[in-house]
């Protein structure tokens, strides 16, 4: 199992295929995605890599977190995410990951926070049909109706579908197809829509329900110092040498 990446949602557009058909895609951008920390079994009990993306001002980062980045000798990041990986997929701290980490035709899972819609009624939030237009119904045509039973249990059950805040929930869309990538501009084009608004941070992983393509870079597509893609160089997790 290899690491995923952190990307920022740019927006939607369309790409034309060779036969003239157009495909609606979401544009995702990798902004200076680097390995900030590595977790190992001896010290942490599990193996993982912590990635950082974007950039942050020092005044917006707490002193302990600034020390965390200073230890890794990387710039301050706006977003930190930890990815569990196999022992042979551990990357060195400071490694930069390219958009070629995923390949065209590959299926990925994308997680993010959905767009917030504010306070919404039961018809918009849950698709309820509402009450009748006439026959005794007054001022309650779009209400959700009864919410409970009788004296027993004498309460409204938890998770009852009612009016409330709609959206702004962490959600994952599975098996989205990667149409193409642009390593020079660090862009990934994914078929269809993904959770989140423009500018939102998203987490992209290999699909869990479909096998990873055999020609996908393993353990990662790494940027060389000159900005070009370099072959991946896995390192053993601390305490796993020998």
UniProtKB/Swiss-Prot annotation:
One of its GO terms (cellular component) is cytosolic large ribosomal subunit. Disulfide bonds: none annotated. One of its GO terms (biological process) is translation. Pfam families: Ribosomal_L3. Keywords: Methylation, Ribonucleoprotein, Ribosomal protein, RNA-binding, rRNA-binding. The modification N5-methylglutamine is found at residue 151. Methylated by PrmB. The keyword Ribonucleoprotein applies. Transmembrane segments: none annotated. GO terms for molecular function: rRNA binding; structural constituent of ribosome. One of the primary rRNA binding proteins, it binds directly near the 3'-end of the 23S rRNA, where it nucleates assembly of the 50S subunit. Belongs to the universal ribosomal protein uL3 family. Part of the 50S ribosomal subunit. Forms a cluster with proteins L14 and L19. This is Large ribosomal subunit protein uL3. The gene is rplC.
